[in-house]
Amino acid sequence: MLQLLLAVFIGGGTGSVARWFLSMRFNPMHQAIPLGTLTANLIGAFIIGVGLAWFNRMTHIDPMWKLLITTGFCGGLTTFSTFSAEVVFLLQDGRINWALANIAVNMLGSFAMTALAFWLFSAASAH
């Protein structure tokens, strides 16, 4: 149990630091769409897609790795709470169209990245 807890802890900490770095690096690039949060969410969606496809196919892998990557790293990297707050800030500033665009890009982009990663990994491992 302690090993599983440490896997989530290490993955979550690493993902959180990665999200902070992406936010610091990319959020200043655009005033309406927080690109760091978007980048973190899209990368996390892709990683979780690969992870889920990998763990579905490789059932012998220690569950600790699934916890480290999906629950830990992706949980720390992706952030619905920050995304939600950024949408609220855009709405408070009266930038309704940008808020709606931010919602659409984050939601559709995350779904697309997860599906793409799952499909790519499944196709590659079938050969």
From Swiss-Prot:
Coiled coil: none annotated. Its main location: membrane. Na(+) binds at residues 75, 78. The chain crosses the membrane at residues 4-24, 35-55, 71-91, 103-123. It holds the Pfam family CRCB. InterPro entries: FluC. Signal peptide: none annotated. One of its GO terms (biological process) is cellular detoxification of fluoride. GO terms for cellular component: plasma membrane. Keywords: Cell inner membrane, Cell membrane, Ion channel, Ion transport, Membrane, Metal-binding, Sodium, Transmembrane, Transmembrane helix, Transport. It is a multi-pass membrane protein. It is found in: Cell inner membrane. One of its GO terms (molecular function) is fluoride channel activity. Na(+) is not transported, but it plays an essential structural role and its presence is essential for fluoride channel function. It catalyses: fluoride(in) = fluoride(out). HAMAP family: FluC (MF_00454). Belongs to the fluoride channel Fluc/FEX (TC 1.A.43) family. PANTHER family: FLUORIDE EXPORT PROTEIN 1-RELATED. Fluoride-specific ion channel. Important for reducing fluoride concentration in the cell, thus reducing its toxicity. This is Fluoride-specific ion channel FluC. It comes from Enterobacter sp. (strain 638).
